[in-house]
UniProtKB/Swiss-Prot annotation:
High-level lineage: Eukaryota, Viridiplantae, Streptophyta, Embryophyta, Tracheophyta
Gene designation: GOLS10
Active site (record annotation): K106
Assigned keywords, A-Z: Carbohydrate metabolism, Cytoplasm, Galactose metabolism, Glycosyltransferase, Manganese, Metal-binding, Transferase
Protein's recorded name: Galactinol synthase 10
Protein purpose: Galactinol synthase involved in the biosynthesis of raffinose family oligosaccharides (RFOs) that function as osmoprotectants. May promote plant stress tolerance.
Organism: Arabidopsis thaliana (Mouse-ear cress)
Superkingdom as given in the UniProt entry: Eukaryota
GO terms of molecular function: inositol 3-alpha-galactosyltransferase activity; metal ion binding
Length: 328
């Protein structure tokens, strides 16, 4: 099924001042549905403020996100970009978990061509150190972190079943005699540094229409920029928590806003500590957008002037509508 034409953003009412930037760089995340994933996006927005990120957070959002959730995100300083779904081809409908069908729509972020470079972060990610320097990586590459095959989403693959993982391939050797060539490197798509480009978007769209999901050329960056929690118990020798910049709460039962500690591995002290760190940020009212801007304005007259100039705004939209339109 061909994707539908992308809508221009819809204006969302809110009484929050808008602080514009040059429009060249931004963080971006994705949201769909009416469940509680908006809480993850709020946590991410506040986390980026806590580490003094210099660039805004854009939320690529499907039309089914309720108005109430949109208003919450706008009030947290997020830039709302409504997108239309991208549907997987019929031959891939049963490839992986059901929510992966929704995840095809993330390809739309390559259409955000008003930005020169973006850093994509899943909504269940939290940043604990400033990562703005990743915007300065050489252009022309997709930057990502190698995935861990020990994570549950790989459970139906040969890699998972035999205990082979590209994070520590020396632990379990790949049986070439029975399974053929060693699998190509795969990255975890929860964190990406990329350059929006319409030709790239069309190439990606054509690729998923005719092939099964696979890896494509990228430049690896250290796992400190996307710690998949399964690494803590599968590859502890690879992890130094003091050096971690970005944590991906993707293991079963690890979403902080749903955390009970009852699922497997969730009773670990390091997991509890990381969940607490997420909640400390989420519940910190000084990191709420309006409060943060007011406090920063007292210290920075330039910020104060910008906030005053924009104080009449009743909504927050992206800096410019995307020029992108998909083919009918």
């Amino acid at each position: 099924m061909a994707p539908t034409e992308m809508n221009i953003e819809r204006k969302v009412e809110a009484d929050v001042a808008v602080i514009p930037n040059d429009g060249k760089r931004a963080y971006v995340t994705f949201l769909a549905g009416n469940q509680d994933y908006w809480m993850g996006v709020v946590g991410l927005a506040k986390g980026l403020r806590k580490v003094k990120a210099a660039y805004p957070l854009v939320v690529a959002m499907l039309p089914d996100v309720p108005k109430e959730h949109r208003q919450i995100l706008v009030a947290q300083g997020c830039i709302i970009r409504e997108i239309e779904p991208v549907y997987p081809p019929e031959n891939q409908a049963g490839y992986a978990m059901a929510y992966y069908v929704i995840n095809y729509s993330k390809l739309r972020i390559w259409e955000f061509v008003e930005y020169e470079k973006m850093i994509y972060l899943d909504g269940d990610i939290q940043v604990f150190s400033n990562i703005d320097h990743l915007f300065d990586t050489p252009s022309g590459y997709l930057y990502a972190v190698k995935d861990c095959f020990c994570e549950g989403s790989w459970s139906k693959t040969p890699q998972y079943k035999i205990g082979y993982c590209q994070q520590s391939p020396e632990k379990v050797r790949w049986p070439m005699n029975s399974l053929g060539h060693v699998p190509p490197l795969y990255f975890n798509a929860g964190m990406l540094v990329f350059e929006p480009n319409l030709l790239t978007y069309e190439d990606l769209l054509q690729t998923v229409q005719v092939t099964t999901p696979t890896s494509f050329a990228e430049q690896p960056i250290p796992s400190t920029y996307n710690l998949v929690l399964a690494m803590l118990w599968r590859h502890p020798e690879c992890i130094d928590l003091d050096q971690i910049n970005v944590v991906h709460y993707c293991a079963k039962g690890s979403k902080p806003w749903r955390f009970t500690g009852e699922e497997e591995h969730m009773d670990r002290e390091d997991i509890k500590m990381l969940v607490k760190k997420w909640w400390d940020i989420y519940e910190d009212t000084s990191l709420d957008y309006k409060t943060f801007v007011e406090n920063e304005s007292k210290l920075n007259p330039i910020v104060a002037a910008l906030a005053s100039k924009e104080s009449g705004c009743d909504g927050l939209t992206s800096l410019a509508p995307s020029a992108a339109k998909s083919n009918p």
